[in-house]
């Protein structure tokens, strides 16, 4: 029996090592993931009209998006809202038509968009947005508008791109200390295109802008034929950065103008997003991978030592005992065989959390597969969030199945009650936090507030699809025969001896969460930067590697600590296995708090509440995901070792 256990343990460890090695090799060359465009390419002939769209105003200081036309910019005769998917609405996107008129490959200079005379209210609105460093986001042919910024990186010049341009800027006139607000009222657009030599048709591969603040002047009365003296296409006078800036004050007249330049590019349409997705910190990601792999190898060595040496020796010794007296003299994990599968306290709640963890695990895994295949690229705006929501809903089937299977193993009979709690506990907590945050956003009149129609759609996804699927999964899982325990449970619980200080439940649980968090914290930095500093994150190959390492780390650290716990004759492993790996969520939230105070510039109370509210939801989801991994690892481990020894 011992040799059979040894062989099975070796096979498991070898297959696990091969699996990790195979995954690593699969992604070592394509860690960025490849890109499948979210839309079909569109060809433009010379003179074709190009439709520019405006999106939300964004700020990393407030994290509150606003509609472009919430400020008194020049408007088209009729504002038309673009159709948006669920993810776009939840992100606060508000895509609308713009008054800009572009003709393909026809340069324009100093086009007058319109003029606005500021009153006290509009001047205050512009000043507030400038002070909060809001950026204007636009879209052309599904490409976001970027501002090119030249910088010197390691002695060589390079260009980085920032999404959107600032509404304005703050500064002082020469010789004055009084701070003034200036408006970016002239935009110099550059549209880059790739031309087909055979057909002469062109495809757009870049959309850039350089914003200027200029106090436009003109002679005579204002009319449709007015020519500006500060920017005149007839005299080829261009706007320059040294021009007198346009101040934002009450009763000031602001004239909005723009240039359009077209530049041919060697970049092909299929590669046009490379500029936006180009990452210059690959070395840091690889360091993260290597760092995490070192943790995995260390834990794998410990697990191998336990399973291939200690357990083999223990099982051989236990199986060779001749008398009951000799067995009673032994100490260690075998002594608790009659209690190790005793029903845990709050077993119903454990079933619910395990089912929810399976739902989270399935959602994350499938989402990453789609992301690596390119279906959730940034060109598919809102696609990532939409996919995660829909996958969460449909993974309810597996949540119900997992919770009811465990519930039946615990000899439960009321599977409908478990299915109900599985369908409602986690979503109810998340929804309560979400509704409070949404109310705060509504109070700020931000476009980030979820409309009632979208709210109804979310409720329908929950009650109309997710809940029934949880019950279907629960029914299927409960109908299957329960897994038998490898050993019988004694009627009278065994007394647990006094434990050493390092085996204290709270201490061991907190220690157990450090390594899983250590495996992901570097990648977590880039994810937080992407979310809260308005940058692209599209390195799902790296992320998938880290995710696999996280799974292995959670499983191994929990198994190691579970073994030490059983050797101390403490058989209350059910909840502790869940909390050991799940405690990594506590470190995630603490790191998010550290990130808030060291990297973000948020000053408003509402914005801070939004940040910590969303990070609380993320930490809660991380808790159930990692906790479930640790629980199943320990369940497999205990069933394996106790099925491999002779029990009299």
Swiss-Prot record:
KW Transmembrane helix (keyword) present: yes
Residue ranges that the UniProt entry lists as topological domain Cytoplasmic: 307-355, 403-422, 477-506, 560-577, 626-648
UniProt motif Endoplasmic reticulum export signal: location: 637-642
Lumenal face residues: 34-285, 377-381, 444-455, 528-538, 599-604
Signal sequence segment: 1-33
Localization (cell): Endosome membrane; Golgi apparatus membrane
Membrane topology designation: Multi-pass membrane protein
Predominant location category: membrane
Keyword Membrane: yes
Annotated domain remarks: The C-terminal KXD/E motif functions as a Golgi retention signal, certainly through the binding to the COP1 coatomer.
Protein name: Transmembrane 9 superfamily member 8
Organism for this UniProt entry: Arabidopsis thaliana
The gene coding this protein: TMN8
């Amino acid at each position: 029996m011992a040799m059979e256990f040894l062989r099975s343990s070796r096979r498991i460890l070898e297959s696990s090592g091969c699996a990790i090695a195979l995954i690593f090799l699969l992604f070592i060359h394509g860690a960025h993931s490849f890109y499948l465009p979210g839309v079909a390419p569109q060809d433009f002939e010379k003179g074709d009209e190009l439709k520019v769209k405006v999106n939300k105003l964004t700020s990393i200081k407030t994290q509150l998006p606003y509609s472009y036309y919430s400020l008194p910019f020049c408007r088209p005769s009729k504002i038309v809202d673009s159709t948006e998917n669920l993810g776009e609405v939840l992100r606060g996107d508000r895509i609308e038509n713009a008054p800009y008129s572009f003709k393909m490959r026809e340069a324009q200079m100093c086009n007058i968009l319109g003029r606005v005379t500021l009153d006290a209210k509009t001047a205050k609105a512009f000043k507030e947005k400038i002070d909060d460093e809001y950026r204007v986001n636009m879209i052309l042919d599904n490409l976001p508008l970027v501002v090119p910024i030249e910088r010197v990186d390691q002695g060589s010049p390079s260009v980085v791109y920032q999404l959107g341009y600032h509404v304005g800027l703050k500064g002082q006139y020469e010789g004055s200390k009084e701070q003034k607000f200036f408006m970016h009222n002239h935009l110099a657009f550059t549209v880059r295109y790739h031309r087909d030599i055979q057909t002469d048709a062109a495809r757009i591969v870049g959309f850039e802008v350089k914003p200027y603040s200029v106090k436009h002047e003109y002679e005579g009365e204002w009319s449709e034929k007015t020519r500006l003296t500060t920017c005149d296409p007839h005299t080829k006078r261009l706007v320059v950065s040294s021009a007198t800036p346009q101040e934002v004050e009450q009763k000031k007249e602001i004239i909005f103008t723009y240039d359009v330049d077209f530049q041919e590019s060697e970049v092909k349409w299929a590669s046009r997003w490379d500029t936006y997705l180009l990452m210059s910190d690959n070395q840091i990601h690889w360091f993260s991978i290597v760092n995490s792999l070192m943790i995995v190898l260390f834990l794998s060595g410990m697990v191998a030592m336990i399973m291939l040496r200690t357990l083999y020796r223990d099982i051989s010794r236990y199986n060779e005992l001749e008398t009951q007296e000799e067995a009673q003299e032994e100490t260690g994990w075998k002594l608790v065989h009659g209690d190790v599968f005793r029903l845990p306290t709050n077993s119903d709640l454990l079933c619910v959390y395990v089912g929810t963890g399976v739902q989270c695990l399935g959602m994350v895994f499938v989402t990453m597969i789609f992301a690596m295949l390119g279906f959730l690229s940034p060109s598919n705006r809102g696609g990532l969030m939409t996919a995660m929501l829909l996958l969460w809903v449909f993974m309810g089937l597996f949540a119900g199945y997992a919770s009811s299977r465990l519930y039946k193993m615990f000899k439960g009979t009321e599977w409908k009650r478990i299915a109900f709690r599985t369908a409602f506990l986690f979503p109810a907590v998340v929804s309560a936090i979400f509704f409070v945050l949404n109310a705060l956003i509504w109070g700020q009149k931000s476009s980030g507030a979820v409309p009632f129609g979208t709210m109804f759609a979310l409720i329908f996804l929950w009650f109309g699809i997710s809940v029934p699927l949880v019950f279907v999964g629960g029914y299927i899982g409960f109908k299957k025969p329960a897994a038998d325990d490898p050993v019988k449970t004694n009627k009278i619980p065994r007394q647990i001896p006094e434990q050493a200080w390092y085996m204290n439940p709270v201490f061991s649980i907190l220690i157990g969460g450090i390594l899983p968090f250590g495996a992901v914290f570097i990648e977590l930095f880039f994810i937080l930067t992407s979310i809260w500093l308005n940058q692209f994150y599209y390195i799902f190959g790296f992320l998938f590697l880290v995710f696999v390492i996280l799974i292995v780390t959670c499983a191994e650290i929990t198994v190691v600590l579970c073994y030490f716990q059983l050797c101390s004759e403490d058989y209350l492993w059910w909840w502790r296995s869940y909390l050991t790996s799940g405690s990594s969520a506590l470190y995630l939230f603490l790191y998010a708090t550290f990130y808030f105070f060291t990297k973000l510039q948020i000053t408003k109370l509402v914005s801070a509440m939004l940040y910590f509210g969303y990070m609380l939801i993320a930490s809660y989801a991380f808790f159930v995901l990692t906790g479930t991994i640790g629980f199943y690892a320990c369940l497999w481990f205990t069933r394996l070792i106790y099925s491999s020894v002779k029990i009299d």
